[in-house]
Amino acid sequence: MAKVIGIDLGTTNSCVAVMEGDKVKVIENSEGKRTTPSIVAITEEGEVLVGEAAKRQAVTNPENTVYEVKRLIGRKFDDAEVQKDLKHVPYKVIKADNGDAWVEVRDKKYSAQQISAFILQKMKKTAEDYLGEKVTEAVITVPAYFNDAQRQATKDAGRIAGLEVKRIINEPTAAALAFGEDKKPGDSKIAVYDLGGGTFDISIIEIAEMEGEHQFEVLSTNGDTFLGGGDFDSRVINYLADSFKAESGIDLRGDRLAMQRLKEAAEKAKIELSSAQQTDVNLPFITADQSGPKHLNMKLTRAKLESLVEDLIDRSMAPCRVAMKDANLATSRITDVILVGGQSRMPKVQEKVKDFFGQDPRKDVNPDEAVAIGAAIQGAVLSGEKKDVLLMDVTPLSLGIETLGGVMTKLIEKNTTIPTRKSQIFSTAEDNQSAVTVHVLQGERELARDNKSLARFDLTDIANAPRGMPQIEVTFDIDANGILHVSAKDNQTGKEQSIKITASSGLSEEEIKRMIQEAEAHAADDKKARALIEARNEADASVHGARKAVEEHAAAPEHDKTKVTEAISAVENAAKGEDVEAIKGAVATLMAAMSALLQSAAAGQAQAESGAGAQGNAKPDDVVDAEFEEVDKK
């Protein structure tokens, strides 16, 4: 049975896991790490680097290194949050033809879905290397507060990466699945506080034991898709830049290279301050002026860090209050608090969470791996490998349509369990109105203009009738991925119009297919590049071995040594080119020449030894055998 892998596609780091028997295995990547940086870089030669390789060269190649692209996925370029982020990233964010936020790297435009697909391809390859088989299906997690456009965009990224996305599930829900695997028997209500690299979610989840089955029901969810560890880093970066400017008079913000170094130092300092009270930020040769090079060297205390980010931590408390209210629960009813996401390791965050819920959060759930583990469990459920789990997730935001006066009329309220289907009858606003426009909205505001527009479509050829008489049945259908399908039907004529919301900020089918082809081409290019590297490595090793053999067998016949020397030159010339087969052919010729040399050398050595042996056994005439006796030593 083909495995369905679980992928946590994170803002800062990503993780992949798979169910093996009754246990979940978090899979190490090719560098031996259990998480992979969600970073993609394009080199001068056009090679795509993902993960650690991309992170290592970020300081010297900041404008061509894309990170935190999850904050752009499914978003418009003109969104206020995107505009705010533009000031903090060294790479170029552009407005695509459809209004989306894309990135431009080395004069080529990439959608956020394409960049995410590079990361997903790395996760897919990591799983394939471990399992020893092709992987085509996955469960991918998203922040609970992702809207329809962001969910669809994530699913598209999976397709571009060559994965059939069997299910999109919410990150806190996945973490709850991971926690539920090892929890003690009995019913419980848990709060999952998920503060990751770029997003924040809070979910209240009930875990019930039903005839040996774990039933997970999400009671409520809330969050902020633009609050995460990256925002904490930005506060530290700005503090360091301001302090350096006050000290030296130089503003580092105009220097991309310096800012990339500052970003890495800020992240490192923040992490260190989770276990230490003070840390040194030391960046020699950060910049230079007429007087010479300048060095950044300053101390950062935990207290200072906490004062810099206190309002960000407080911002996470407001969604917690809303989630508890929506779940209709007092904090005293929560049995366990689970922390997810790397930023939740910060002591001040844990202190605030403890104060809010009135109990210490659990420390036995790995905040970096829990989401991928939960996704793998859901993958095993979908493949039929695991049968004792039932998951009931919710839609995070209300869905409805625009009605007379620019009002949003909700058909599906937020925190409704999915999948779900709701219908409502609407009518015309004018006499003899022959068409209606169905404007689909997502959000909690009363007026249509204040909510997110998902799509518009028209139902035409409505029979002439006075206003209010035609019956237009609008149906909203949300699937298990939280993706919406909408239909409108004239009950008198039976005419129907429907739409799958691919979101007004999504990619067209043609664009997705083109990007899939590009991704496959990249995979083919990567394979070709790897084959070339391996062939060159083999060539290098064979040349080294051949030279050593010629030195060691100096007495071998001259024509054999000449053949090897000529073959070495041929291999070196072939290795300068990019023809893998030519390199392999030259290496094969060298190996044959080497074999002939070694055979000749061995034959020569055997002949020399037999000659020396025969000579050694003959006694010259003047040699006399003598008797001797041993004399005791005094």
From Swiss-Prot:
Transmembrane segments: none annotated. GO terms for molecular function: ATP binding; ATP-dependent protein folding chaperone; unfolded protein binding. InterPro entries: ATPase_NBD (IPR043129), Chaperone_DnaK (IPR012725), Heat_shock_70_CS (IPR018181), HSP70_C_sf (IPR029048), HSP70_peptide-bd_sf (IPR029047), Hsp_70_fam (IPR013126). The modification Phosphothreonine is found at T199. HAMAP family: DnaK. Acts as a chaperone. Belongs to the heat shock protein 70 family. This is Chaperone protein DnaK. The gene is dnaK.
